[in-house]
Amino acid sequence: MYEYLTGLVTVVAPQYIVVDVNGVGYKLLVANPYRYQEDRTKKVQVYVYQAVREDNISLFGFTDQNEKNLFMQLINVSGIGPKSALAILANPDHQGLVDAITNNNVSYLTKFPGIGKKTASQIVLDLRDKLTNESSSSLFATTQLTVDATVNRELKDALEALAALGYKERDIKKVQKALMKEEQMATDEYLRQALRLLN
């Protein structure tokens, strides 16, 4: 069982990254791959969960132990598999997720893909008492980003990646204005351009 991998990110794709560890490339399914786009010349440490099925072995990656712990809590809920849990964690507001669970906010949880009212209620039932004060603390705090509805999906994903990287909303808004003047690009191209503007 892997705990974490340390290496260089060599591939950033819409649903996964590849981390090169001593010449071996590990494909990791992650919640927001574009957060790893910022500097691919430095080694990163990615926490790992290995999911084993009869026909498939998958590795899921996390930025830190807290994100992994939240993932592990989610997959223990009936009806939530690893990919569903990862889709929930794709929202960078992990504090909001924890608050929704502890405050019995079922409607908040139903906004995630594939999560209906029944599953959302099950998440609250199973996890409300298990989430400790430590897991629901500011460790999950992140930039809250409101993106204009007119922004295309690729740019929206890039802006959310900037928020996940820790950039302030005012800086992201400045970059958004500049990028909206450009022709439409892929998410990774938007992100590269945004990082150039920010740096």
UniProtKB/Swiss-Prot annotation:
Residues 150-199 are annotated as: Domain III. This is Holliday junction branch migration complex subunit RuvA. GO terms for cellular component: cytoplasm; Holliday junction helicase complex; Holliday junction resolvase complex. It comes from Limosilactobacillus reuteri (strain DSM 20016) (Lactobacillus reuteri). GO terms for molecular function: ATP binding; four-way junction DNA binding; four-way junction helicase activity. Keywords: Cytoplasm, DNA damage, DNA recombination, DNA repair, DNA-binding. SUPFAM superfamilies: DNA helicase RuvA subunit, C-terminal domain (SSF46929), Nucleic acid-binding proteins (SSF50249), RuvA domain 2-like (SSF47781). Belongs to the RuvA family. Residues 1-63 are annotated as: Domain I. Pfam families: HHH_5, RuvA_C, RuvA_N. Homotetramer. Forms an RuvA(8)-RuvB(12)-Holliday junction (HJ) complex. HJ DNA is sandwiched between 2 RuvA tetramers; dsDNA enters through RuvA and exits via RuvB. An RuvB hexamer assembles on each DNA strand where it exits the tetramer. Each RuvB hexamer is contacted by two RuvA subunits (via domain III) on 2 adjacent RuvB subunits; this complex drives branch migration. In the full resolvosome a probable DNA-RuvA(4)-RuvB(12)-RuvC(2) complex forms which resolves the HJ. Residues 143-149 are annotated as: Flexible linker. It comes from the Bacteria. The keyword Nucleotide-binding does not apply. The keyword DNA-binding applies. Its main location: cytoplasm.
